Amino acid sequence: MRVCDVVSNSVWYDPRVRKQIVEYMNNNVDVVCVGLKDHRYDEEKMKNVPCPVTLADIDEKYKKPLSKVEVLFKEFNRVKKLREAILSQKPDIIHANDLDTLTAACQAAKKLDCKVVYDSHEICVENHQMRGIYKKLNALCEKTFIKRINKMVCVSHAAADYFENKYAIEKPMVITNCSLKAEKTASNDKHDGFEILNHGVYYGGRGYDIIVESAALLKDYPEIKIALRGFGAMEDELRKRAEEIGNENVIFYPPVLVNELIPYASKSKVGVAITENTCLNFELSVSNKIFEYASAGLPVIMSDIPEHRYLNEKYNFGIILKENTPECFKEAAIKLYTDKEFYDVCAKNADRLSEEVNWETEFSRLIEIERSWVNG
């Protein structure tokens, strides 16, 4: 069975695609990858991608500020380049990652008479960054080509319901962005105090400002420490606000490599996974951090969106915030700090979540279906 894994970036920094490649290879699947040479292309890091990779390159004239008409021509050029790269691989199955690869994948599949898996990492047309003619074009592409695929995959049950209802298709298979079994880490070497961690890229809608503000409300609990690990556009603003509050229990840790996130998280006591539903895409998503914290054995304080509720009702591994406010966060932090029995139950259940929901188990379900297509 030959699978062509298709993505519209330079592959090496896309964690979901890299996990796909590794799991295909672990299951003795002949996997090749097709991508696009983008601004993050790194020749040295490409050597770490464990399968053959073909990177298409869009024409130079489209690598500059473009008019609306030129944007359309750039899209046609991008689809053409991806399609040609896929055709050169002659796969049995095309695994199209996200909407921006779907058109090329379906066009190539028609010529090759092969199967297509559409793996939607998000609800692209409902992303707050998708606007104007670009949004209309993508909505048209999804509506047209989603009827031509053989299987759809998405990252949450809430998103699966959305796609099923919107396009009247078979309910997509849910394969969450969970962690690898091998990444599971438990640590008795905890940081001082009761440390509550939010790690990732510092940008709006992810709760970093909320937890920093909560520090002002937690001064009567000096053992509770608010920790942030990462980088991003909000860092200066967050540091400034922490200084204004004057609470020394707000800690900023430097960023670490992706494969170090879980071991470092295991040194904290609680994880934070806040997604503010500023658009439908965010509302129907699931925070990858939940699975990272669970793999580190941490209870989680999380926002009230459908998939977080679904997971917590099933596994009872943390607290769903009533509202995304410093006041509600303070209540959750104090509950986990003062109620040791509740904390221990949540920690045990987080461990169970990571045991039952891991990448190897999740992705093997798709590989089984793909084998049935090829083997008849």
Stretches with model-predicted labels:
Residues 265-283, 298:
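Acidic donor-binding loop of glycosyltransferase active sites
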Residues 314-315, 319-326, 335-340:
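Conserved acidic donor-binding segment of nucleotide-sugar-dependent glycosyltransferases
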Residues 236-263, 270:
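Nucleotide-activated donor-binding/catalytic signature segment of Leloir-type glycosyltransferases, i.e.
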Residues 5-14, 23-73, 159-166, 174, ...:
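N-terminal strand-loop element at the rim of the active site
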Residues 4, 153, 189-215, 226-227, ...:
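Conserved donor-binding/catalytic core segment of Leloir-type glycosyltransferases
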